[in-house]
A protein has these predicted regions:
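Non-catalytic interaction-recognition regions
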Residues: 1-12, 19-506
Length: 506
């Protein structure tokens, strides 16, 4: 090994560069790309729940990261809005409200502008309809028929379906807003349907699709495969298009509308085979090369028993219920720590929500994307240890320091590294670019979380060893204030990259 120790002068120069850089020493990519990030992927008529958390926060962090690096990013939620579940819902609404005009084939319109169902109604109707379809063959056939008529363009069914989609989207946008998550596109599987006839005919004409027992398949196995690689079913025996065909049509749609150089799919790791099949088929079809399509799988959110998280009664915890629980817990923890006691009640509630979201997001993103983790709200909402609230407290403390310095007329000045704690802090600030590059190239937000935590720890040690406002030497005081400001800026950048906001005070 060769040990190298940087001189105080070299560290001081580097600290000054970072402090003077709005990007805190972070470089952009040399060749920006057009990137599509597909995440979310919720089904119409289903409320967001804890199982949807990972795709949402990982995908949002990646879109923030890729934009920060300089790529032109388009994020797409890709809703599940087309398929048998729509026919199931149509029939369930028909059973409860048979007199609605959507079911009258002779009705010529216009159809009502207001939806006959709410999100709560859909949340009740969807599992009812699904259960009936699974156990009753006659009902299942009716659901298939309704789905076919919807997809064929029956006006009443299309009008009712649009209500399902609009009501769901309003609810989803509200949930996303509470998490600070946005999408560029709110497209669904239905948006790819116009491309399917052309796609199917083209693949048939080029003999890429071939007949098989009444269906049309695309073979994707390769010589040398070490595992079974079944063909994709492009068109099934009933003439319907499944998920493989729909995903290929979506790739075609995106190629024509965006022409991405890279497409990332942030979807449960259990869908790995599906995406490998689709990506291989895409390459065979000449849509996009397999190397430019990536499935970023992730593990599950588990309960203390190591199984996917459930509520005490065995149900799935809805996301709005999770956020409400987190808000209450965060408010209680703030009161215990005597934080926010001097701010108005409304502002204190806003701060508590910010703390709650930081806890939820950081607890997820700080885990390696591909691994499972145990969800423990009490542990996550703590102002000590490797948590989101700890990082917020560190940043807010620096903001408070900056306000006091301003009120006392203290200004930042040239950096002069003298103490070991200052050296450690500057080295950690300098590590940001490597952490950023690692998170970007590996598509792993936990690397950013690790960096933020180490930076907060380094600042805590620095602050204890190198007093700022009580320092009698004005040169040292100005230097340390510059280091504090540089730390705050970098924390702000990193936390923004994982979708975490910082309150002004706590």
């Amino acid at each position: 090994f060769i040990n190298v120790k940087l001189s105080a002068a070299a560290l001081s120069r580097r600290a000054a560069e970072i402090a003077g850089d709005p990007r805190s020493g972070a470089a952009r990519v040399s060749q920006p790309r057009r990137v599509v990030i597909d995440f979310g992927g919720w089904n119409v008529a289903k409320e967001m729940h804890i199982g949807h958390l990972r795709s949402t926060v990982i995908g949002d962090s990646l879109q923030r990261l890729f934009r920060f690096m300089g790529d032109a990013v388009t994020s797409d939620v890709h809703l599940g809005d087309w398929g048998l579940q729509m026919g199931q819902l149509i029939n369930e609404v028909r059973l409860e409200q048979p007199d609605l005009p959507y079911f009258d084939a002779s009705f010529t319109g216009p159809y009502p502008q207001n939806s006959p169902v709410t999100m709560d109604d859909l949340g009740r109707l969807y599992p009812q309809a699904s259960a009936k379809s699974k156990t009753d063959e006659a009902r299942r056939n009716e659901d298939r028929q309704a789905t076919q008529e919807l997809q064929a363009g029956r006006p009443g069914y299309r009008a009712l379906w649009r209500h399902f989609c609009n009501v769901t989207r309003i609810g989803l946008e509200r949930e996303c807003a509470s998490l600070g998550v946005t999408f560029d596109l709110w497209k669904g599987e239905s948006d790819a349907q116009p491309f399917i006839p052309e796609l199917v005919e083209d693949l048939k004409a080029r003999a890429i699709a071939e007949p098989d027992a009444g269906a049309w398949i695309v073979r994707v196995a390769r010589e040398g495969d070490k595992k079974e690689m079944p063909p994709i079913i492009l068109v099934n025996r009933d003439g319907a298009i499944g998920y493989h065909g729909s995903d290929l049509a979506t790739i075609l749609d995106r190629r024509r509308s965006i022409d991405p150089q890279l497409s990332l799919y942030v979807v449960d790791q259990r869908q790995a085979l599906h995406f490998e099949q689709v990506f291989r088929a895409s390459e065979r079809a000449g849509l996009m090369a397999e190397a430019s399509l990536e499935h970023l799988g992730f593990g599950t959110v588990n309960g203390p028993d190591g199984k996917p998280y459930k509520t005490r009664d065995g149900g799935v915890l809805k996301l709005h219920e999770l956020i409400s629980q987190a808000d209450r817990t965060a408010l209680g923890r703030m009161q215990e720590a005597e934080l926010g006691a001097d701010v108005p009640e409304a502002e204190r509630a806003e701060i508590a929500h910010t703390v709650a979201v930081a806890a939820i997001k950081f607890s997820d993103l700080s885990n390696v994307r591909t691994t499972n983790y145990v969800f423990d709200l009490d542990r996550f909402i703590s102002f000590e240890g490797k948590t989101g609230p700890y990082l917020l407290y560190a940043a807010v403390r620096i903001k408070s320091l900056a306000r006091r310095a301003l009120s006392e007329g203290v200004s930042a000045g040239p950096v002069s590294v003298e103490l070991d704690a200052e050296r450690t802090l500057v080295l950690q600030l300098d590590a940001f670019n490597d952490a950023l590059r690692g998170a970007y190239e590996k598509r792993m937000p936990h690397i950013l979380c690790d960096h933020a935590y180490l930076l907060a720890q380094a600042f805590s040690s620095f602050y204890a060893a190198a007093p700022i406002l009580v320092e009698s030497d004005p040169v040292r005081k100005a230097s340390r204030l510059t280091l504090a400001a540089a730390t705050l800026r970098q924390l702000e950048i990193v936390l923004d990259l994982i979708g975490v906001a910082i309150p002004e005070r706590m």
